[in-house]
């Protein structure tokens, strides 16, 4: 991915495809599944069959392979790019979540960045 001149990311991104369930708040009946394109300690970029408005609060449930529990994180939609009627890129900034999920995400990112020889990032803001 090319960055615009002067653009800097706050967190290292890990490109990995994981299943993610997204529930818009407060519309729990509108839950849908998508998959990640990449994620970091600050947020996630996912491919979705549906679109969401910018600013929409969401609950994300990230399914991590070889892990006994899912990661539950809260966020808000920052950017949406429609690729087709049924494929949308949605960028979500993390705004919180349960402490265990935040810690588990940080550990998962540290493992993956260590394998790539990248310095780990700061923890998710509470």
Which positions does each model-derived feature cover?
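N-terminal helix initiation/capping motif
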Residues: 1-39, 106, 110-126
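Short solvent-exposed strand/turn elements
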Residues: 17, 52, 87-107
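Short strand-loop-strand
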Residues: 18-61, 91-93
């Amino acid at each position: 991915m090319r960055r615009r001149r002067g653009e800097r990311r706050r967190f290292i991104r890990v490109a990995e495809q994981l299943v993610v369930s997204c529930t818009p708040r407060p519309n729990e009946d509108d839950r849908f599944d998508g998959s990640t394109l990449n994620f970091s300690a600050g947020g996630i970029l996912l491919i979705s069959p549906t679109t969401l408005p910018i600013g929409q609060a969401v609950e994300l449930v990230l399914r991590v392979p070889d892990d006994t529990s899912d990661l539950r994180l809260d966020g808000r939609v920052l950017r949406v790019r429609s690729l087709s009627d049924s494929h949308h890129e949605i960028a979500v900034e993390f705004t919180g979540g349960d402490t265990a999920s935040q810690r588990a995400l940080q550990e998962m990112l540290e493992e993956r960045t260590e394998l790539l020889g990248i310095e780990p990032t700061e923890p998710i803001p509470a």
